[in-house]
């Protein structure tokens, strides 16, 4: 009788857990939004690409893999996004290597990201949430999400406002259940997402732009963990016979002048770092300064996010520079 009593207790607990898990999964399905990272991760794990571009919002808006392919003949996908740190790029690369066979990683380097800490929560989930089950996902969980607030793990949708989520529940649910990755869902008044992962920003009236201070590099303030993951990524690429190239995209001349001390210190630091690592670093604000315009007209803000037309031109230039750098080796 005691056995039955205990068995029922265990069974009850188990059933409550099952119901909780099912409920959390259902809420996640209905409330966690379909982000462009969902499309990006799906693309890179289900298709083979030669070039994978990782990095920040500058890379996302400035680098169009389809334009690059016309020059290099190499297929590519843009996996950059604002808020992507070294740790994310590292585990994204590990995930892709687990599922496919990338030939080259192009890392877009925004110096400001190396002196700041990655924010908890949403910022990790943006990537982690979209990983299919894999060794990379388990490692990524252990080294990032596990250190976050438990709400992040159990209620990934809690950081998105319900007023934003509720009207979209039906669409979110349908898109996930039917495996719908149509890019038209990701279009807005100011930009559109392309299947290649590139986000095309529509041109803006630059005379109306307001200056705001970008994330700046500060000497002696480098976050060790960020550099650690960048080194890990470079080592991982070397061990797996994946070429690694670092790129810093052009910044408008007004901004370069306003913060010249900070930028000069950053270029020196990263120039030296990549040289020590023995990898190619293409900086479009120093040795390739003249390769592309720094006139504000080509951008949508002082920070250096290009409009779509400029990004297409820049991607062609970047592809040519990559080709000639490859031939020099």
What are these regions (language model features)?
Residues 234-259:
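Active-site segments of SGNH/GDSL-like serine hydrolases
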Residues 12-30:
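Hydrophobic membrane-insertion alpha-helices, especially the h-region
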Residues 124-236:
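Secreted/periplasmic serine-hydrolase-like ester/acetyl group-modifying domain
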Residues 1-3:
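Short, Lys/Arg-enriched N-terminal segments with co-localized hydrophobic residues
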Residues 260-329:
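Long, positively charged, glycine-interspersed low-complexity recognition regions
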Residues 52-55, 306:
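Short hydrophobic beta-strand that contains or immediately precedes a catalytic carboxylate
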Residues 32-50:
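Alpha-helical transmembrane signal-anchor/signal-peptide segments
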Residues 54, 58-145:
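Membrane-embedded segments
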């Amino acid at each position: 009788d005691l056995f039955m009593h205990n068995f029922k207790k265990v069974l009850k607990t188990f059933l409550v857990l099952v119901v909780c898990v099912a409920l959390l999964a259902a809420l996640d399905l209905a409330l966690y939004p379909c982000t462009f990272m969902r499309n990006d991760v799906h693309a890179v794990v289900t298709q083979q690409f030669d070039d994978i571009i990782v990095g920040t919002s500058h890379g996302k808006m400035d680098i169009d893999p389809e334009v690059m392919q016309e020059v290099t003949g190499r297929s590519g996908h843009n996996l950059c996004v604002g808020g992507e740190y070294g740790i994310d790029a590292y585990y994204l690369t590990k995930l892709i290597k687990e599922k496919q066979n990338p030939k080259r990683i192009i890392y877009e380097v925004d110096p400001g990201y190396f002196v700041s800490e990655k924010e908890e929560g949403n910022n990790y989930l943006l990537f982690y949430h979209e990983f299919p089950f894999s060794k990379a996902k388990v490692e990524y969980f252990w080294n990032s999400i596990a250190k976050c607030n438990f709400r992040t793990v159990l209620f990934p949708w809690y950081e998105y406002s319900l007023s934003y989520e509720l009207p979209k529940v039906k669409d979110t649910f349908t898109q996930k259940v039917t495996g719908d990755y149509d890019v038209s869902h990701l279009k807005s008044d100011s930009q559109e997402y392309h299947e290649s992962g590139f986000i095309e920003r529509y041109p803006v009236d630059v005379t109306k732009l307001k200056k705001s201070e970008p994330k700046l590099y500060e000497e002696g303030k480098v976050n060790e963990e960020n550099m650690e993951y960048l080194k890990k990524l470079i080592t991982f690429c070397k061990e797996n016979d994946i070429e690694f190239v670092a790129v810093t995209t052009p910044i408008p001349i007004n901004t370069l002048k306003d913060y010249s001390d900070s930028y000069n210190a950053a270029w020196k630091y990263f120039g030296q770092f990549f040289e020590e690592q023995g990898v190619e670093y293409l900086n479009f604000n120093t040795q390739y300064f003249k390769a592309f315009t720094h006139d504000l007209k080509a951008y949508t803000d002082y920070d250096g996010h290009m409009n779509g037309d400029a990004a297409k031109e820049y991607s062609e230039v970047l592809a040519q520079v990559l080709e000639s750098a490859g031939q020099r080796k």
